[in-house]
Amino acid sequence: YITPDEFNKVGNQVQQGIFEKYMSDLNQQLRIPENDNEYANRVKNLEEKLDIFKTIAEPTFSVDHFTTASLPNFYRLGTVIYNDTIEAQMVERNEWYKIKRAPLLAPTKKQPVFLYEDTKISVYPTSITSDIQVSYLKQPAMINWGYSVGSLGQYIYDSSSSVNFELHPSEQVDVVTGILLYSGVIIQDPTIIQVASQKIQQEDINEKS
C-alpha cells in the first residue's frame, strides 16, 4: 500500500497534470476550423471544466504596477477591469512604444491599457493606482488526505484537515487511473503499471477520435 503522504504527493501530481492538459487540449481545439457541432462540444466541455478555476480578485499595487504574485493560486491572467466596468486592453511592449509616440493614442481612464510582463501588470494612464480587478485561472488547491496515527500505528482519516480534488466530476476515472499508475511505481508492481498505462493510452485515443 501507499501511505497518506505518498497519496497526497501522487494525488497532487495527477491533479496538476490533468489541469494543465486542459490548456493544451483547448489550444489544440481552437486551432481546428470550427465546422461542426462536435468541435463546439469539445471546446464547450473543456471550458466547462475550466470554469471551476475561474475567479476574480484585486491585485496589490506596488510603486508603479500591480502584481499577480499577490493573487491566491494564480495560474493564468484573463482580463483586467478598471472601476468595475471598463476592460483594459492588453498591449505588447513594442505596441506600447508606438502608443507613447502618438499623443492621439494616449490611454485614458475611459480607455486604459496595460502591459503584462512576468508578474507585473502596468496599467496606463499611470494615474490608475487602485480600483483594478483581474479575472484569472487559479491553480487547483493542493489535495490533502488528512490523518492521525492511532495507538497501533494505523492511519485514521481526519476529514477536518482533508482537502478534496477540485477537478470536474467527469475526471474521476482519470484521477483514479493516474493514482494507480504512480502507486504501481511506488510499490513496484508492474501489473498495476501496465494496466494503468493501457487505460491512460486508451483514454487519450478516445478523446482525440
Regions found by a protein language model. Give the residues of each.
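Glycine-enriched, solvent-exposed interface loops adjoining structured elements
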Residues: 1-209
